[in-house]
Amino acid sequence: MSKKLLIKTWGCQMNEYDSSKMADLLNAANGYELTEEPEEADVLLLNTCSIREKAQEKVFHQLGRWKTLKDKKPGVVIGVGGCVATQEGDHIRQRAPYVDVIFGPQTLHRLPEMIKQSQSDEAPVMDISFPEIEKFDRLPEPRAEGATAFVSIMEGCSKYCTYCVVPYTRGEEVSRPMDDVLFEIAQLADQGVREVNLLGQNVNAYRGPMHDGEICSFAELLRLVASIDGIDRIRFTTSHPLEFTDDIIAVYEDTPELVSFLHLPVQSGSDRVLTMMKRPHTGIEYKSIIRKLRKARPDIQISSDFIVGFPGETDKDFQDTMKLIKDVDFDMSFSFIFSPRPGTPAADYPCDLSEQVKKERLYELQQTVNTQAMRYSRQMLDTEQRVLVEGPSKKNLMELRARTENNRVVNFEGSADLIGQFVDVKITDVFANSLRGELVRTEKDMDLRSVISPTQMMAKTRREDELGVATFTP
C-alpha cells in the first residue's frame, strides 16, 4: 500500500509551483501519492505565505488542527515550508515542537532526506538556508497536469521594497541556466503542455547563464521558449516596471505565442508613496511602458497590484492612484489594504489612517477596476475567441472550461476529447467572473500545424547562384 502525502498551499503561484515539485520529488524518491484527506496522510506539509496580515497565526491555527491528528497517529510527519518557515523557523520550533520538518523555499529539494532524518533523530529537522539555485538540480523530471504548466525561471528579489518580505524569505535574485529552463519546458511540451507560465518574483530580471559563459536575457528567453514545438502560448508572472525594457516590449511585436495580457504591478499612482515604498519608478514612467506596449500590441490588456492605505497616504495620493487606474484602464487588479510585515522598514512607519478610510478607499478602487473589467468583457460579446480548453467546467461537469488570451474563463458545451486543445468559441454571455461561449471550430479545422517533409523543406529554402550552385538555408 502506497504512502500518502497531503500538501496544503497558501500564497502565490511560486508556492503552487513549489508544492507541485514537492509532490513530484516525494513520489519519485519514496512513492508518496497525494491525498486530500488529512486522516489518510503519512506526511502533512504546509507550504506557507507571509505576504498577508496574520500569516503566522494562520499557520499555528492549521498546525493545531494537525496536532490532533498526530496525537491519534504518532507516526505522521508534519512539515512546514515556504516563507513563514524561513521567517519564523525558530519560533515554530518553540511554539509547535510537534512539527518534524521545517524547510524554506530554497531547500525543498532536501525533503526526502529531512523526512527520513526526522523519523530517526530528535525532531524537528530544520533547513531554511538559501543555497542559490541548487534545488532545481535535485528535482525529478516534471510531470504535466493538463495543458498548462508553471515553470520557475528565477528565484528571489533584490529590490527591497519597504513593505515586502520576499528578499528576506526567498533570498536575492538568482536565475536558472537557460538550458535547464528550455529542457524543462520541452519535457512538458512532450507531455502535451500547450501553455507555459514563466514564474519569478521579478521574472523580467532574468539573466540566465548559458553554456558558453554568455548571459541570456529575458527577451531572448521568451523567443527561445516560443520556438519550442508544441508551445503555443506563453505567459509570465510577476514582472517589475524597472526592468520592463524595450527589448522585452519588442517581443510583443514579433512573437504571437506571447499572450496579449500582462500583469505589471505598480502598487500606487502617487510618486510620493512610490518613493516611500522604494519603488524605483514614477507614475509617468509606468504609463510610458504601457504606451510602448500598446503600440507594439494594440489589443494588450493590463492587470496590476495595488496597496491601499500605505503609511502616510493622503487623499491626494489615493486620487493619484485612481487617476492612474483610469488612465491606464486596467482590466484586472489584485488590491489589498497595507499590512505591516515584521522585519520590513515600512512596519515601523507611523500611520494615522483609520481602518474605515482604508476600507472605503479599497472599495472605491476595486469597484472602478471591476467596472473597467466588465466593459472589456462586454466588448467580447458576439466575438470569436481562440481559447485553450483546460478541463471540465467547475460549475457544470457536463461542460468544458477554457481560457482566453486575456485570462478570462469561458464555459461552453463540448466533448471531453477537446481538453488540451485550442478551439474557437463565440462569446454569447458575460458574467462577473466568467464568459459563456458556443463552439465554432476545433483545432483540426484551424491549420495550427503544417507538416513539411525534408524534401519540401529543402526545396523551400533552395537558392541557386548565377553559376547554378545550390545552397540551402536552415
From Swiss-Prot:
Per UniProt, the keywords (alphabetical) are: 4Fe-4S, Cytoplasm, Iron, Iron-sulfur, Metal-binding, S-adenosyl-L-methionine, Transferase, tRNA processing
Keyword S-adenosyl-L-methionine assigned to the entry: answer is: yes
State its cofactor: [4Fe-4S] cluster
Entry keyword annotation includes 4Fe-4S = yes
* Residue positions binding [4Fe-4S] cluster 2: 157, 161, 164
Which residues are recorded as binding [4Fe-4S] cluster 1? 12, 49, 83
| Cited InterPro entries | Elp3/MiaA/NifB-like_rSAM, Methylthiotransferase, Methylthiotransferase_CS, Methylthiotransferase_N, Methylthiotransferase_N_sf, MiaB_methiolase, rSAM, rSAM_horseshoe
Q: What is its main location?
A: cytoplasm
Q: Name one Pfam family in it.
A: UPF0004
For this chain, the family text in UniProt reads: Belongs to the methylthiotransferase family. MiaB subfamily.
The record ties this protein, via HAMAP family, to: tRNA_metthiotr_MiaB
What is the protein's given name? tRNA-2-methylthio-N(6)-dimethylallyladenosine synthase
Organism equals Vibrio campbellii (strain ATCC BAA-1116)
